[in-house]
Amino acid sequence: MDDGSTISPKASVEGFLNKLNVRLLGQLHSGPAAARNYGARHAIGNFLAFTDDDCAPSPSWLQTLAAGFDSFPDCALGGRTINGVPNNLYSTTSQLVIDYLYTHYNPNRQRATFLTSNNLALPAERFHALGGFDAAWKCAAGEDRELCDRWVSHGYRMVYVPEAVVEHFHTLTWRTFFRQHFNYGRGAFYFRRAFARRRQGPIRLERPSFYLAAIRYPFSQRQANKALAVAALIIGAQVASAAGFFWERANEIDAE
């Protein structure tokens, strides 16, 4: 699915035309949520599997997800994503934040509540019945969290399948790292607002212990010298995310 990219993926796809039943679809740039929905509408089959253009699924990725659907045919399945550029500290930190979120939100793998869209598979019928991703989200920042919450709030289950591995090659600089987390904060505002409206309550943030645990998390995963640098970047990411959240909130207040 080509969401209005400046470099056409046509040449990459052509090498598989004689090997796989594959189609290249395209649209004017509308954001990842709209692009996934567009691709899903043209997909054939009972299940949909999503990944991103900077990801490399393992050779057994689809087979592993298919085996998961044998056991959980009505559930959304999400696999494990690993950092494909381990020598990049910013990319390492960004993936470690996701790893922490999986640890926090998915203590029971068969009752997961958060799965990222770069390693996600769902029953097509239920995906379409829910309306797919919310296409109002124009940037890659929280649209998967919103879909997961909508899925669970309808009584559907999500299952974490760590054997379904995708490698993520997202090279970051200090500038793109902080921009990414600023956008995550923007997305978090809309997610929290949707979460609150769905439950007819006020917008609530996580408790302080959630953010403190995120800062401590690298020390349980890495050598102390590298963990300190990662923890410092996580603090910076939290500041950037908070800035994005309150920036988006202020814009909404001004619009009112």
What is each model feature region?
Residues 60-91:
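Conserved donor NDP-sugar-binding/catalytic core segment of glycosyltransferases
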Residues 1-26:
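Acidic donor-binding segment of Leloir-type glycosyltransferases
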Residues 21, 25-32, 56:
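Short, acidic/glycine-rich phosphate-metal binding loop used to engage nucleotide
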Residues 48:
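Short aromatic/hydrophobic "clamp" motif used to bind/position activated sugar donors
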Residues 158-243:
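Active-site-adjacent helix/loop segment of glycosyltransferases
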Residues 83, 103-125, 138-142, 146:
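A recurrent flexible, glycine/aromatic-enriched loop bordering the glycosyltransferase active site
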Residues 56, 113, 128-160, 164-167:
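Donor nucleotide-sugar recognition loop
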Residues 27-43:
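Glycine-rich, basic loop-to-helix element that forms the pyrophosphate-binding segment
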